[in-house]
C-alpha cells in the first residue's frame, strides 16, 4: 500500500522487514500519536491499514493542510489518509484473477572494516584509554556479518475478485493471499484477506448496504540488523569441530550474541497470529429533492496472540573450560500474550445539495460517536527442576 503513496509529498520509510508496517509521515511529528497519520477506511477511524489488500482499494485521499484538523480534530493533527475500498459498479458480472511475484535484495550494504582493520582500531582505542592491547591470538576470523544474515527475499501476491451489479443490487467479493520472505534469513510473513460489499436499492430514494474487510496474518519473527553491524569481524561464524556457533570476544559477548545465534538458533521460536475484522452497515435516504440523510454503523475488531519460546542455547567459547558455554540461565521458558481491541463508530450525516445555473452548493452536518476498548493479557513461566519445556509449539502455553 505504501508504494501507492510514493510521489505524494510524504515521507515514506520501509524497514524492509517482512510484513512490517511502513513509517508514513504526512505532517511531520508531534507529541500526540507521534508521527502516524489517521487512517479513515470506509468512514471508520483506524491507526493502521496492514489488514487491507491493495487490490481492494478503490481510492486514497490525503489531507495534510488545516482541513485535516477542521474535520477530524486533534486526531488529524498528523494528517489524514482517507481510503475507500472497492464496490461493485453497474454492469455484467466479472471475475478478475491476478498474481505477481518478485525478489528483493540488499544492494548497498554498509561498509565495515575487515578483521585486521578492526584489530588495529580497537587496540588504538585501548591505548588511548591507557589499557593494554587485547590479545587476538584466538580470534582469527574475518567475517562480514551482513553477508551471513542477509538473503535475497521473495514476495508474491495473488488475488481474485467477483463483481456484479444491476439497477437495484450490486455486490463485490475479493480475496487475496500474500507471502513474503524477508531479506534476513528465516523471516516469513503471510496474509489472507477478504473484502465483501453489498448494496441494495429498496426504493428510488432509499438504499441500504454493508461493507466487510477481514484478514488473517502470520507476522514474521523479525530479527535485528544492529547486531550484525556491531559484532566484531574477528570471530568465526561456526566451529566445525564442536558443531556449534561461536561466541564473540570477551569485550562484546556480555552485550550481544553471535548474530547467527539469533537468526538460526532462535528462528521459529515465536508464533504469532493476528486476526482483523472491520465493516459497516448503512442506510441512505433522499428526501425533499435536495436533502440526503445517511446513517452508518461501523465496527473494527482485532485479536493478536503471541507465544514465545526460550530454548537452551550452547555456543563454542575458547575462553572457558570445556570450550562450550550455555547462554543465559540455561533454562527453557515460554511467554504468552493476547491483545484484543474493539472499535465501534456511528455516523449521522445530513447533506444538502442544490444547483442554480453555473453555481452549486453542498452543505453537510454530521454527528459521530466513537468507542474504543483495549484488553491485554500476558504471562510467562520457566522450566521446573529438570522439567525441560519441549521445543514444540503445541507445548508453548503458560
Where are these regions (language model features)?
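Short acidic/polar hinge/loop motifs at secondary-structure boundaries
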Residues: 42-70
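Surface-exposed loop/interface segments of Gram-negative outer-membrane beta-barrel transport/assembly proteins
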Residues: 17, 89-143, 168, 182-189, ...
Amino acid at each position: 500500500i505504501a508504494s501507492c503513496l510514493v510521489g505524494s509529498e510524504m515521507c515514506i520509510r520501509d524497514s524492509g522487514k517482512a510484513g512490517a508496517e511502513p513509517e508514513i509521515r504526512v505532517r511531520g511529528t508531534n507529541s500526540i500519536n507521534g508521527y502516524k497519520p489517521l487512517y479513515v477506511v470506509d468512514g471508520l477511524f483506524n491507526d493502521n491499514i496492514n489488514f487491507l489488500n491493495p487490490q481492494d482499494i478503490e481510492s486514497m485521499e490525503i489531507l495534510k493542510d488545516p482541513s485535516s484538523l477542521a474535520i477530524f480534530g486533534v486526531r488529524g493533527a498528523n494528517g489524514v489518509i482517507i481510503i475507500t475500498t472497492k464496490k461493485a459498479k453497474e454492469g455484467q458480472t466479472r471475475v478478475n484473477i491476478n498474481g505477481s511475484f518478485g525478489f528483493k535484495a540488499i544492494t548497498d550494504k554498509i561498509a565495515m572494516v575487515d578483521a585486521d582493520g578492526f584489530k588495529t582500531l580497537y587496540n588504538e582505542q585501548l591505548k588511548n584509554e591507557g589499557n593494554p592491547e587485547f590479545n587476538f591470538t584466538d580470534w582469527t576470523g574475518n567475517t562480514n556479518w551482513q553477508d551471513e544474515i542477509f538473503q535475497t527475499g521473495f514476495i508474491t501476491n495473488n488475488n481474485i475478485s467477483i463483481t456484479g451489479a444491476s439497477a437495484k443490487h450490486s455486490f463485490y467479493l475479493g480475496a487475496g493471499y500474500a507471502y513474503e520472505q524477508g531479506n534476513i534469513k528465516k523471516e516469513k510473513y503471510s496474509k489472507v484477506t477478504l473484502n465483501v460489499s453489498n448494496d441494495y436499492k429498496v426504493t428510488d430514494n432509499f438504499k441500504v448496504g454493508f461493507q466487510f474487510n477481514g484478514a488473517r496474518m502470520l507476522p514474521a519473527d523479525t530479527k535485528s540488523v544492529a547486531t550484525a553491524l556491531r559484532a566484531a569481524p574477528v570471530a568465526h561464524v561456526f566451529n566445525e569441530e564442536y558443531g556449534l556457533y561461536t561466541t564473540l570476544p570477551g569485550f562484546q559477548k556480555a552485550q550481544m550474541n553471535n548474530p547467527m545465534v539469533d537468526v538460526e538458533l532462535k528462528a521459529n521460536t515465536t508464533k504469532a497470529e493476528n486476526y482483523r475484522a472491520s465493516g459497516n452497515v448503512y442506510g441512505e435516504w433522499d428526501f425533499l429533492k435536495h436533502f440526503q440523510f445517511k446513517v452508518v454503523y461501523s465496527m473494527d475488531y482485532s485479536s493478536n496472540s503471541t507465544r514465545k519460546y526460550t530454548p537452551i542455547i550452547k555456543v563454542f567459547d575458547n575462553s572457558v573450560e570445556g570450550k562450550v558455554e550455555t547462554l543465559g540461565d540455561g533454562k527453557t521458558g515460554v511467554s504468552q500474550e493476547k491483545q484484543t481491541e474493539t472499535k465501534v463508530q456511528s455516523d449521522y450525516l445530513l447533506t444538502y445539495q442544490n444547483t442554480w445555473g453555473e453555481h452549486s452548493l453542498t452543505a453537510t452536518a454530521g454527528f459521530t460517536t466513537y468507542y474504543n476498548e483495549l484488553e491485554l493479557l500476558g504471562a510467562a513461566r520457566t522450566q521446573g527442576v529438570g522439567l525441560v519445556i519441549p521445543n514444540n509449539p503445541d507445548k508453548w502455553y503458560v
